[in-house]
């Protein structure tokens, strides 16, 4: 099985909250696609609660589009990581990590301004596969934590695992 890009970086050296360019590629038509690692929690030390990350998923996708989409950037998808330490964001375009961090911070402020559970988009049996598994309180705690700690930028060169180490794992 091929080794995925996300498993060639040293998770013990990741900072959080932080933005990392996980992958850049060109489509056959010449469009640029960038995948960002938006790391909310330090791997193997912290993780977001299930209800909070699910609510954040519903809110974050819309708020990030409001703050980041432009003539040169269009978000394709924002999805939570299975390890519950962050989200992957795939988009058309090549925005700088600092611009992504600024949009992320603005989105977290937007989360804090959501008044009630009723204001969570697509929170119903028809549009959500686990519509009862939500917590606005937990989503707000996650957002506040990001804002309190500040959003850094990760350097892939500093995180890269050596070929020797990878062979031994």
From Swiss-Prot:
Give the reaction(s) catalysed.
S-(5-deoxy-D-ribos-5-yl)-L-homocysteine = (S)-4,5-dihydroxypentane-2,3-dione + L-homocysteine
Q: InterPro entries of this UniProt entry?
A: LuxS_sf, Metalloenz_LuxS/M16, S-ribosylhomocysteinase
Q: Which cofactor does it need?
A: Fe cation
Source organism, top-level taxon: Bacteria
Keyword ATP-binding listed: no
GO MF terms here are:
iron ion binding; S-ribosylhomocysteine lyase activity
Task: State how the cofactor is bound.
Answer: Binds 1 Fe cation per subunit.
Q: Where does Fe cation bind?
A: 54, 58, 128
User: Which GO biological process entries does UniProt record here?
Assistant: quorum sensing
Disulfide bridges in this chain: none
Please provide the record's keywords in A-Z order. Autoinducer synthesis, Iron, Lyase, Metal-binding, Quorum sensing
Q: What is its EC number?
A: 4.4.1.21
State whether keyword Iron applies: yes
Q: What broad class of enzyme is this?
A: lyase
State the similarity comment: Belongs to the LuxS family.
Q: What biological function has been recorded for the protein in this entry? A: Involved in the synthesis of autoinducer 2 (AI-2) which is secreted by bacteria and is used to communicate both the cell density and the metabolic potential of the environment. The regulation of gene expression in response to changes in cell density is called quorum sensing. Catalyzes the transformation of S-ribosylhomocysteine (RHC) to homocysteine (HC) and 4,5-dihydroxy-2,3-pentadione (DPD).
Q: How does it assemble?
A: Homodimer.
Q: State what protein this is by name.
A: S-ribosylhomocysteine lyase
Annotated gene? luxS
């Amino acid at each position: 099985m091929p080794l995925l890009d996300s498993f060639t970086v040293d998770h013990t050296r990741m900072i959080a909250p932080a933005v990392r360019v996980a992958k850049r590629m060109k489509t056959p038509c010449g469009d640029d696609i960038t995948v960002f690692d938006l790391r909310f929690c330090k791997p193997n030390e912290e993780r977001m609660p299930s209800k909070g990350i699910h609510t954040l998923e519903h809110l974050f996708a819309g708020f990030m589009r409001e703050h980041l989409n432009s003539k040169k950037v269009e978000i394709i998808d924002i999805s939570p990581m299975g390890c519950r330490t962050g989200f992957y964001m795939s988009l058309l375009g090549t925005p700088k990590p600092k611009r992504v961090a600024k949009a992320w911070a603005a989105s977290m402020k937007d989360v804090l301004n959501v008044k009630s559970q009723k204001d969570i988009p697509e929170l119903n049996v028809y549009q959500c596969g686990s519509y009862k598994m939500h917590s606005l309180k937990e989503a707000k705690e996650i957002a506040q934590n990001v804002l309190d700690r500040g959003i850094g930028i990760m350097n892939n060169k500093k995180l890269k695992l050596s070929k020797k180490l990878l062979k031994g794992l």
